[in-house]
Amino acid sequence: MTKLSGILLAGGQSVRMQTDKARLFYHGMEQYRYVAKMLSTQCKDVHLACRQDQSFDINCIYDLPEMAGIGPAAAWFSAFETLGHAFVIVGIDYPLFNEQELQNLIQERDPQANASVLFNAQTGFYEPMLGIYEWSFYQKLLSFKHEPIISIQTILRNSLVKKVLPLNEKAIISIDNPEQYQSILKSLNEK
């Protein structure tokens, strides 16, 4: 199977974190660099999905102007419009997601499904920012294009999705506030 393009999702505005989560340091480097490096080991090319007002030193796919204000789904629209094919997406919110988890996700890919996405068995929800999205998912996405807010989670629930379980449940812990950030830094420093 051909290698996928890798999309690093870094465009979200983090009100709770009060800083750009892509610039947080984990693993001795900014999180966006860590995720880009990880994706480069498994993907044919790596792109960073972000807002128009953000600037990074790697290949960016900026949210399309007509997608402004629709939330994270802007990254999916922009990636499909720019690339025109399937991709693996990894959000910067998951500092414990590693290369083994990425390899597992890619190995578990089902190209006949609309998507292959990590599933959180504890919450019963998909982790949309950790998945592989086939071109057929774009067709589903387009049917929601004129909604004021587009939920990738909702589209996944109405699609053919391969549930992929993480090798380690901690890999899908999302860091969303300063307290969680400090806690994860402490646990990483103890290793």
At which residue positions do the language-model features occur?
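Nucleotide and nucleotide-moiety/phosphate-recognizing core
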Residues: 1-128, 132-137, 143-149, 157-172, ...
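Active-site-proximal helix-loop-helix substrate-binding element of RNase H-like nuclease domains
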Residues: 154
